C-alpha cells in the first residue's frame, strides 16, 4: 500500500512568532491562513470551534490540531494545513498550553497520516522544541511532510515468508470489533503473523498494534506469516477478514440511514451538529453535559523488586480477566451477545504484547508496577486518540477503561468515580450505558436528561427513564463519550438527538418549546382523573405498570384506574435471596389494599432472557431470549412457581381483588399445565377462583390466539417482547435497536390477529408494553380493538387526553391505514398527517 499523501502545507501556510489572545483567536488566525490560501470558504473557523465542543483537539506536548466538523466538509475547497507557531503559548483548555497550532482542512481522512506523524514528533521532545522556536518555516514544512518522522533508526517493515494482499472493505476502517476477530484468529496458530500497511507493520496477534495502523476503507495491506502452520493461519485469517465485510457494510448503511432520517418533533431553527441516537424517553431539556467516567487519579511511583512487581502484575491481570469474564457472561445473559462483545474486546486488550512489554520496560527502569502500568496504558491510548479517527478514539477509551480495572487491582485507591460525582449544576448525563439500578437511583434534581452510547429504546434503562420523566436517548455510539464536560447542549428524547453548542436562537426556541410542553402537561394533569372516553362514548380502561405497593399512590394520583401489570420479578431482582411465600403474600396483599378494591393484575415470575438473578442459579444459555424463560422456567422450577401461587391465592382469600397472568406462553399445553397447578393450589387453600390470563409476547401465541382464548380469561400483549420476536431483533443491540419499532406493520398485524382470536371467545385484550404509553400508539391500539391499556404512571395523563380528543371511528380508520403501511416510518407519518388535520 502506498501511504496516503499529506494534505499540502507550504511556507505561505506557516505563520512564525505569532501571538494569540486566547484559543478562539488562535483558531481564527489558523482559519484565516486557510482562507487566504483558497483551502476553505469563510466561516470555516466557526466549524473548527464547533469541533472543539465535540472533542478536545489538544494532542499534548504543546500541539493542537483544530479542524472542522464532518457536516461542514462542503466548506473545504481543497485539502490544506496551516501552522501557527506560538512561542509564548496560548491556553487551549485549563492547564493545557499550545505552542504549535496545526489547522487542518480535509475533504476526507487523508490527514490521518499527518496525525500519525505528529504522534511520532511527540516522542521526540528535542525536535518538537525546535519547531516551537525555529525562524525557518521550511523546518516545520519538512517535519510535517517528510516521508518519516525525524527518527531514522527504524528500517521499513518487510514481509514474512508466506503472504497475501488484501484491501480494507470495511466502511469504518479497521476498528476494535473486526480487529479483535483478526487477533483472535491469528493467536490460534503458532506461526508468527504480521499485517503491513506501507512501511508500517503490526503483529497480527496484537489488537492495539492493528488499531495503531489506522487502516481506512480502501487501504491496501499485506498479511504475511512465517512458521510451520503459516499457510493454515493465512487461509483461516483471510476467511475471517472476508466474512466480516458484509456485516460491516450493513452496519455502516444502518448508521447512515439513521443520521439521514428526518427529525420528528422539535427542530432547532439553525442547523446544529447533533449526536444522533434513538429516542428512548420524550422531552426536551437544556443543560451542560457531564460524562460519567472513572476519576483521574494520580498514581504514585513506588518502586519494588522486579520479581515482586511481576507477580503483582500477573495477579492483577488474572483477576481483571476473571472480572471481565463475569461481566461478559452477565451481560450476555441480560442484554445479549452484541453488548457482551464490548467486554470481550476489552479482555482482548489485556493480551496485547505491546502493552505488557512497555509496562515491563518501565519496571526494569526502576519504576513501580502500578505507575508503569498506568504510563503504558496512557502512552498507547494517547497514540490511538491522536490518530484523529473517532472510531479509534473510542478504542482509546476502551483501553483506558480496562487499564483502570487493572490499576484498581494494583492500587485500590485508583477506583473510579460513580453517580455521586455529579457537578453542582444540573446536567445532561452522558454514559457508555447505565444499569437499571443506576438509572433508578438518578437524582432528577441533578440530572436533566440522559444519553447513552449503548442500549436500546425498549431496554429497562429506557423504561425507567420514562418513569422518571427524564428526556433520554440511547445507542448514540462512541462519539457521545468524546464530548467534553461543561459543554451546553439540548437533548431531545423524542427525536433521539443531542445538539452540541447550540446558538442563542436555538436555545430560545428550545426554551419556548419546553414552556409550551409544560403548559400542555399541566392541562393534561388537571384532567387526569377523567376517564379515557372517546368523543363518541367508547371507554378504554387505563391501568398502571407498578412493581411495589408504595408506588400505587402515585399511580392513582396520575389517573390510573388499577394496576394492569405488577412485575413480580422485581421482588426477586432487588435482593440477594429468594423471597419466601410469606414475604410475597404480604407484598401482594399490601398492593391490593393500596388499590382499595381496584383491579390488580399480577404477572407470575418472568425471569430469563434479559432478566437474570444470581441467587436463582439459572444455567448459562447461549441464547437466553430463545431459552428457558417465562412459563418455560416456571414449569421447570416448581420451587419458584408454587410458593408464588400460594401467596397469591392466600392474598385473594384475604380479600385481594386480583388476577394472575403468566408470561411467555407459547403453546396450549403450557397454559393447561399452569391452570392445573393453579386449580390444585386453590383447592388446597380453599381460596376463591381467580381470572387467569396470559401474556401475548411471541408470534406463536398471537397466531394461536383463538385456540389459547378457550383456556385463558384474558390476554395482555407485551409489545416490547412481541416486537423483538416478530422482527427477530435483539432490542438491546445498539446497531439494530432503531429497527425494533413496535409500530412496524408486522407487529400491528400480530396485535390485530390476537384481538380477532380473543373476540371469538369473548375475551378482553389489554396491552402493557411500551406502545400503550405513547399517545399515538395508544390511539392505534384503541382503534385496533384493545380494551385496556397499562403504562408507566407518568404517561397516563397524556394518553387519556389524546383518547378523549378523538372519536373511536376515527381511531379505527387510523388503525386500518396503519395496517396497510409497509414500514414503521410510514405508520409514524400518519401521526403528523393526523395532527396537521386536527
Curated annotation (Swiss-Prot):
SUPFAM superfamilies: Enzyme I of the PEP:sugar phosphotransferase system HPr-binding (sub)domain, HPr-like, Phoshotransferase/anion transport protein, Phosphoenolpyruvate/pyruvate domain, Phosphohistidine domain
Example of a GO biological process term: N-acetylglucosamine transport
Chain segments carrying region PTS EI: 274-838
Protein family membership: Belongs to the PEP-utilizing enzyme family.
Localization per record: Cytoplasm
Positions with a binding annotation for phosphoenolpyruvate: 567, 603, 720-721, 731
Active site: 67 (tele-phosphohistidine intermediate), 175 (pros-phosphohistidine intermediate), 460 (tele-phosphohistidine intermediate), 768 (proton donor)
Protein EC: 2.7.3.9
Domain PTS EIIA type-2 residue range list: 7-147
Protein name listed in UniProt: Multiphosphoryl transfer protein
Region forming the signal peptide: none
Keyword list, A-Z: Cytoplasm, Kinase, Magnesium, Metal-binding, Phosphoprotein, Phosphotransferase system, Sugar transport, Transferase, Transport
Catalysis performed (reactions): L-histidyl-[protein] + phosphoenolpyruvate = N(pros)-phospho-L-histidyl-[protein] + pyruvate
Stretches assigned to the HPr domain: 161-253
